[in-house]
Regions:
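Serine-esterase "nucleophile elbow" of acetyl-processing enzymes
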Residues: 1-38, 143
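Alpha-helical cap/lid subdomain in secreted, periplasmic
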Residues: 25-189
Length: 189
């Protein structure tokens, strides 16, 4: 978003580790700015392979019994092993689509675009088995939901992605800026 400020007035809402449902719950506040368009960048936190569902994690964190159970499970079987076996996502595909539609309804009078989730490298897949399948699935949901308003990042070069597999480098930010501007020009924005 920072690089877009040379061409557009930008109101940015970012939440590290944020889920799409949290973006939807804040949409009313974003709407007060009367934006000309919305560009959504979410999905990796929603679809990433996890040991436990979001509700399970909240239970573990909310009380002493949950914390003890979580500690025992993680001691007996590592969280990584549980994750690799269960491959849970914090947002189900059905809920992901439902939240997308809710967000689009909130901004029904303006164009709503979405960035695809970054492609998964072999290294990232080896660290988090199953992530490639999940990302492809959720990208397909984004494509179905946004159609020609999806900004496809699938051809980003690996130099544009940090070693963690899901954050952008300086080159990656430049690439995304180029892709956003190309798409906005198609829509005369």
């Amino acid at each position: 978003p920072y690089l877009l400020r040379n061409r557009y007035e930008v109101f940015q809402f970012s939440k590290g580790g944020g889920l799409i449902q949290e973006l939807v719950s804040q949409a009313f506040y974003f709407k007060q700015y009367n934006p000309d368009m919305v560009i959504l960048h979410c999905g990796i936190v929603d679809c990433a392979c996890r040991a436990f569902t979001h509700k399970e994690e909240l239970f573990f964190q909310s009380n002493i019994i949950g914390k003890i159970i979580r500690k025992l499970l993680s001691t007996i079987i590592t969280t990584k092993r549980i994750r690799n076996f269960r491959r849970k996502s914090w947002t189900t595909p059905k809920d992901f689509v439902r939240h997308i539609e809710q967000l689009k309804q909130q901004f029904s009078n303006i164009p709503v675009f979405a960035l695809s989730i970054l492609p998964v490298s072999c290294e990232y897949e080896s660290k988090v088995p199953g992530i490639k399948f999940k990302v492809e699935k959720y990208n397909e949901l984004l494509k179905e939901s946004f159609g020609d308003k999806l900004i496809d990042l699938s051809d980003i070069q690996q130099i544009g992605i940090m070693s963690d597999g899901h954050h952008l480098t300086k080159a990656g930010h430049q690439y995304v800026l180029k892709k956003i501007i190309e798409k906005l020009l198609i829509f005369n924005l």
